[in-house]
Amino acid sequence: MRRRLPRRFSIRTAAVAGGLVLTATLAATASATASATASAAPEPPPPPSRAAAAQGAERTHEVEYFTRPGGHPRHTEVPAATPERLARADRPLSAPEAAADGDVNAVIQTGPVADKLDVVVIGDGYTAAQQDDFHADVRSKWAQMSAVEPYASYKELFNVWSVDAVSNQSGVSGDPGKDVVKDTALKSYFWCDDIERLLCVDTDKVESYAAKAPDADLVVVLSNSTKYGGAGYTLTSQIGYDGIATASSDHPDSDQVAVHETGHSLGKLADEYFYDEYGTYTGAEPDESNASKLSAAQLTAQKKKWYRWIGQTSPDGGTVGAYEGGRYYPKGINRPTDNSIMRTLGREFNLPGREAMIAGFYRYASALGSTTGTDTALKRDAAIKITLPASATVKWSVDGTEVTDARGKKSVTPASLGIAADGRSHTVTATATDNTTAVKDPALRKLLTDSRTWKVTA
């Protein structure tokens, strides 16, 4: 069973106008070395926010946004609170509406929350009569995301939950025009910080609904709109989830932005695009696994970062090497391939990126899932059932000795493993290992093995 990551809190926020963003805090703790690195090479500051400047000391979030499909993002800051013009008095929900508000549904449940990466999707701008539409939108959006590698190969690691947030009006504020104001449960609105495509939300309201789900590692707000836009928040809430995303429910590009943004949250990957005005990077070696000051020859000689992949053909096209430009700088930083999804929407993850994503999945989920509890002793005829990713195998052992005939089986009984009715206590252990060739780093491969032990009373 994978141990849950420790809860932590960050007010840093990233947003993207253009679709889902599933981003997360990049580290629970920082070493003294990392702190020194951060001091030596601070991130470029975002430009001043128009809204933040106008509203003084109001709490703000740093954001990243896309102004159009396929464009590279820009950075700014936005107010954390819903603008006053949108914070008008809400009509109370009727009794039937209130009864439906906050309902939780399992869209996809592959196993217990302790074993899985749990994604919670909350609807906004859907009336009580439109909740079935919301559920259909959740299924559609997740199908698009999970068709992309490495998601497609690891669907068994995810649970997806929907939480119904009943709105008084259909649609969201700012759609189609800036003057449109809608009475919705989560206060989603376009024109955040006067940027048309930036789709912001009341994060406190989001947290109140997310708390209704069995568990939440990532949270998505699906806003009832066809308009191009979205926002994502890189934070960890006080109830434990990493990241909030907003997205237009019916825009075709939102899933691609989601995949890009989870590269940050789950894969801890840097952006691979750059801006000419940033000049030359002169700071310390970046922390992210897909950005380096080193050349391909230096990476190989020093056995650093993606050196194991250099020279191999990558699914995003071309060969893994060291391509100049990345992490916003055109000079002084190299990226693994010319044009992965961390640079351009619609592309694939490159080989180092896929490795990082798979490792990110396993930081939340386990290679071995089971609904058979380990708290109480089992009888000889009790069924032990497990779940595995497609690329994983399992070995079974009794009292520390492997039962080779049971290799690969996903359902066994202690009796079928050879435990006799001898009146003694025994243990049954399942050990699962993901044998994917997409993860080469030995340190990351340690995340790909998990085991579970049951006591048996014969």
Where are the regions a protein language model picked out?
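Secretory targeting and sorting signals
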Residues: 1-41
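Zymogen propeptides/activation segments of proteases
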Residues: 2-7, 39-147, 385-388, 392-398, ...
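Active-site-proximal segment of zinc-dependent metalloprotease catalytic domains
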Residues: 99-118, 122-127, 143-278
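Short, solvent-exposed loop/turn elements at domain surfaces
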Residues: 128-132, 229-230, 349-353
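Short, solvent-exposed linear motifs at loop/edge-of-secondary-structure regions
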Residues: 131-150, 331-348
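Stable alpha-helical elements in mature extracytoplasmic
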Residues: 134-141, 154, 254, 258, ...
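Short, flexible loop/turn segments at beta-strand junctions in immunoglobulin-like
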Residues: 416-421
